[in-house]
Swiss-Prot record:
Gene name per UniProt: rplP
Stretch list, region Disordered: 1-22
Function (record text): Binds 23S rRNA and is also seen to make contacts with the A and possibly P site tRNAs.
Entry-linked HAMAP family: Ribosomal_uL16
Protein name: Large ribosomal subunit protein uL16
Keywords carried by this UniProt record: Ribonucleoprotein, Ribosomal protein, RNA-binding, rRNA-binding, tRNA-binding
Comp. bias (Basic residues): 1-13
Gene Ontology CC annotation, any one: cytosolic large ribosomal subunit
Any one GO MF annotation of this record: tRNA binding
Organism field: Azoarcus sp. (strain BH72)
Subunit structure: Part of the 50S ribosomal subunit.
Entry-linked InterPro entries: Ribosomal_uL16, Ribosomal_uL16_bact-type, Ribosomal_uL16_CS, Ribosomal_uL16_dom, Ribosomal_uL16_sf
Length: 137
């Protein structure tokens, strides 16, 4: 699963996920893409699960690019622990997603196959997504 190899600080504040994506909004590597049209968080497990669904569907046909990376640690206190005594330990990693961000890209397959692969991947994600193609020019 994806996670940073090193970080300056182990824990991060919660923050707020606002605004629209300004970078990574166009299909730039492949011919087809899966774009988020809602905001939210994707865990490393969800990103990997969607990738596996796509890979299984296209078999050895094309190439897949993951355009997002889970770089935010989410901490959690253990079960049945009283409040206080500091922040919990980092439990998992998430990628904060803004509307307009391209999540995955695909190349080397026809549009019908790409559409179906992205449909299977989108079912694994907690965000609303849309199929996009590369704009020439």
């Amino acid at each position: 699963m994806l996670q940073p190899s090193r970080r300056k600080y182990r824990k991060e504040q919660k923050g707020r996920n606002t605004g629209l994506a300004t970078r990574g909004t166009k299909v730039s590597f492949g011919d087809f893409g899966l774009k988020a049209i809602a905001r939210g968080r994707l865990t490393a497990r969800q990103i990997e699960s969607a990738r596996r669904a796509m890979t299984r569907h296209i078999k050895r046909g094309g190439r897949i690019w993951i355009r997002i990376f889970p770089d935010k640690p989410i901490s959690k206190k253990p079960a049945e622990v009283r409040m206080g005594n500091g922040k919990g330990n980092p439990e998992y990693w998430v990628a904060e997603i803004q509307p307009g961000k391209v999540l995955y890209e695909m190349d080397g397959v026809d549009e019908a196959l790409a559409r179906e692969a992205f449909r299977l991947a989108a079912a694994k994600l907690p965000l609303e997504t849309v199929f996009v193609t590369r704009q020439v020019g």
